[in-house]
Amino acid sequence: MTTLENPEMQAQLLSAALPYMQRYENKHVVVKYGGHAMGNPELGKAFARDVALLKQSGVNPIVVHGGGPQIQAMLTKLGIESRFEGGLRVTDEKTVEVVEMVLAGSINKEIVALINAEGEWAIGLCGKDGNMVFAQKAHKTVIDPDSNIEKVLDLGFVGEPAEVDRTLLDLLARSEMIPVIAPVAPGRDGHTYNINADTFAGAIAGALAATRLLFLTNVPGVLDKDKKLIKELSVADAQALIRDGTISGGMIPKVETCIDAIRRGVEGVVILNGKTPHSVLLELFTEHGAGTLIVP
């Protein structure tokens, strides 16, 4: 008999989870969903079930999602070539139309449907809805390898959050609805901007003073030099690990986004493996969690 088939074990698991459920009751938890988990139907169903259970447990979950691979697939299908500056994609007018169509259209509604299939009320949004988020043009700089001079890149309609209004999200929380948000937002200049989903999630979580911001990735979390999972880090610890090279490569911007979210008012940010089924529940409702927690 497995644990799930054993009533006594089920009762023990629920009893152990109860204090954590009480801890997060009526609290905002923002989950950034993307990466490999999004491309796996079974993991997608497990994620939707986790989000539904959070709501049923009294938590206020907010889902922010990406969709880079799906955007690229649609651009290829439409014969739109991608242009890069300094290794970063330039989002021109045609591209941002596709980005909005894929993110706020197909992907967003797929996630909404999965959560609704679990008996909850999810609603698909983007930054444009209710003037929730206004963007400003993002400015990126690189060092020219030939001249060693800093160069400002024009990435087109790539933006960053400039203003976040939580009014709509508070209304939805009181209405028992689950927001699923695509990282697309208008600028005060009238243009539409594509925003990095991690950055967007951090801004939403900061505006809500969320108890937790969870980043679902394709790695277990932050690893030490022996490749073992670090369960908890302070901001100062994380910065030290960046300086000494323990945190490197693509993990650096992820951790820097976590640090920025904490500075915006988030209580704790977690990097965890979205490929692990029910990793969201394991992180929030078990003693040892499931990833790396970064705190002030």
From Swiss-Prot:
Site feature Transition state stabilizer, where: 32, 254
GO biological process: arginine biosynthetic process via ornithine; L-arginine biosynthetic process
Alphabetical keyword list: Amino-acid biosynthesis, Arginine biosynthesis, ATP-binding, Cytoplasm, Kinase, Nucleotide-binding, Transferase
Record flagged with keyword Amino-acid biosynthesis: yes
Compartment(s) where it occurs, according to its Swiss-Prot or TrEMBL record: Cytoplasm
Pathway entry: Amino-acid biosynthesis; L-arginine biosynthesis; N(2)-acetyl-L-ornithine from L-glutamate: step 2/4
Binding site for substrate: 67-68, 89, 194
NCBIfam families assigned to the protein according to its UniProt record, in alphabetical order: argB
Known role: Catalyzes the ATP-dependent phosphorylation of N-acetyl-L-glutamate.
Protein name, per record: Acetylglutamate kinase
Species per Swiss-Prot/TrEMBL record: Brucella abortus (strain 2308)
